[in-house]
Amino acid sequence: MSFTVIIPARLASTRLPNKPLADLGGKPMIVRVAERAMQSGAAQVIVATDHADIFAACVQHKVAVQMTRADHPSGTDRIAEVAALIGLPDEAVVVNVQGDEPLIDPSLIAATATLISRDVPMATAAHAISEIEEVFNPNVVKVVLDKSGRALYFSRATIPWHRDGFAVSKDAIPAGYAPLRHIGLYAYRNAFLQEYPQLSVSPLEQLEALEQLRVLWHGVPIAVHVTPHAPVTGVDTPEDLQRVRQFFAQ
């Protein structure tokens, strides 16, 4: 399946100022993310930004880049603008790769893109949680699926709740219990991506602070690729940045 990767990138970050331009082994983080995405088999990889410094860094490293408006409320709105600007057809598949994922698995990008079909205009990914601390951590978003592998719900709460297992103990994952952690990687059919910014915000989205709940609220199915490999986390803190720098220094 042919697909386009668009990477939204902004300089605004409360914990890591200028994060997309952070040096990782001689290259800016946003360039490292683009290079990983290029290994996925994407037909094209484009950075979407509203900042001249990010634009210049991409040009310097020969990474395709597109300037966008500065008033987008989310990365999804930003990539929708770029998909329209470059003239992607309605049937094109667009993958949104976060700009702070320099170690993202290229095969995960491709696997998520392949889930897009005539009946399913959006897809994402997940993996099984193996640590009990993650089960109860509200910063770890969980997803439950139907028998077809489509999302029933995303939540910061512990879902599904193992009634009998947790009645005995909450110190270990009960036998036979395999909750899924959501991975923030999204693929879209472009026709739906262009409709997305017009969808009204849902009450559930506001309660959980999870943008993807807007899609389920409006009755749009989301397919979920379950990977057996826990992905390397993105760069959100100075400690994350140091860890990734050590990787690229090897």
Curated annotation (Swiss-Prot):
GO terms for biological process: CMP-keto-3-deoxy-D-manno-octulosonic acid biosynthetic process; lipopolysaccharide biosynthetic process. NCBIfam families: kdsB (TIGR00466), PRK05450.1-5 (NF003952), PRK13368.1 (NF009905). SUPFAM superfamilies: Nucleotide-diphospho-sugar transferases. Pathway: Nucleotide-sugar biosynthesis; CMP-3-deoxy-D-manno-octulosonate biosynthesis; CMP-3-deoxy-D-manno-octulosonate from 3-deoxy-D-manno-octulosonate and CTP: step 1/1; Bacterial outer membrane biogenesis; lipopolysaccharide biosynthesis. One of its GO terms (cellular component) is cytosol. One of its GO terms (molecular function) is 3-deoxy-manno-octulosonate cytidylyltransferase activity. This is 3-deoxy-manno-octulosonate cytidylyltransferase. The lineage of its organism: Bacteria, Pseudomonadati, Pseudomonadota, Betaproteobacteria, Burkholderiales. The keyword Nucleotidyltransferase applies.
